[in-house]
Regions:
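SAM-dependent Rossmann-like transferase core, predominantly class I methyltransferases
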Residues: 44-45, 56-136, 145-155, 275, ...
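An acidic site on a long C-lobe helix of protein kinase domains
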Residues: 54, 94-97, 222, 249
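A general structural signal for well-ordered alpha-helical segments in protein cores
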Residues: 8, 27-28, 58-59, 68-71, ...
């Protein structure tokens, strides 16, 4: 038997030893997950003693995290824009940097406006779900090439009671979709150049599906598919294309977009909270 505060201290120390930067937070997340209680419970009940069986289960979770398995893979959850979303090894872990897309759309549109949005490569559907939760009159579609990802997306939409405003389709980008029915297109496509994949942090390679990372030889393969499809189908109705980008290839991407007819003066580059080039918005 040990007190919760002692158990957490041991977990924190073990994670810190294995260079987990947010060791204190993650030790709490894992114990709250194992006990099925909110983290606040651990603080309020820090003197509560747990039996050896629970301690053993917790240490196994700490070991998995120390060996490089992500918190989201262990718990099946990931926070995005202040909400928890179900995830799995079949979808990219939502990143806080991607929240910039939500903030940009909140700058463009009033909260009560009605808009239709399509989320290409929806994965967990954290983006389109968050938009529909922030904008009660938005509706939309999420697409993904992976049926497993679509299943996770549907689960999250149902969890947040927005499944009457969003549907999900298995599609390779815009192949099965008429883009002209939407006001906003959002996407966080795979953008890592193939030769750079091996240099990614082991935690990323260990936990995220390769299909959600691999941007082809130049990192632009999927942008080209999306952008060329838009140009082929566009009926000149004003829309917003909002895409997450990779800082190392952004100049090449701008060059490509201009070559196929996107006007540079209609494209805006946004920086994230780390001052990295992160999102392009085009009208």
């Amino acid at each position: 038997m040990q007190k919760i505060e002692t158990i957490l201290s041991d977990g924190n120390r073990e994670l810190k030893k294995n260079k987990i930067e947010t060791s204190n937070l993650e030790s709490q997340i894992l114990l709250s997950f194992m006990l099925g209680v909110p983290r606040e419970y651990l603080i309020i009940n820090s003197n509560l003693k747990l039996d050896d069986e629970k301690i053993s289960k917790y240490r196994k979770l700490i070991k998995r995290r120390s060996e490089g398995e992500s918190i989201s893979n262990i718990t099946g959850k990931r926070e995005f824009y202040g909400r928890e979303f179900s995830v799995s090894g079949n979808v990219l872990d939502p990143r806080p940097e991607t929240e910039l897309i939500i903030n940009i759309i909140k700058e463009i549109y009033a909260k009560d406006v009605s808009c239709s949005v399509i989320d290409l490569g929806t994965g967990s559907a954290c983006l389109i779900s968050t938009l529909l939760l922030e904008f009660p009159n938005f509706k939309g579609i999420g697409t993904d090439i992976s049926e497993d990802a679509i299943n996770i997306a549907q689960k999250n939409a149902k969890e947040y009671l927005i499944n009457d405003r969003v549907s999900f389709i298995v599609s390779d980008w815009l192949d099965a979709i008429d883009f002209n029915q939407f006001d906003i297109l959002i996407s966080n496509p795979p953008y890592i150049p193939r030769e750079e994949l091996e240099s990614l942090p082991l935690e990323v390679l260990y936990n995220d599906p390769l299909i959600a990372l691999d941007g082809g030889m130049d990192g632009l393969e999927h942008y080209k598919k999306i952008a060329s499809n838009i140009k082929n189908k566009n009926n000149d109705k004003e829309k917003f294309l909002i895409i997450e980008i990779y800082e190392n290839t952004v100049d090449d991407l701008f060059h490509y977009l201009e070559n196929i007819g996107f006007e540079r003066e209609n494209m805006i580059l946004y920086y994230d909270f780390s001052n990295r080039k992160r999102v392009i918005v085009s009208k």
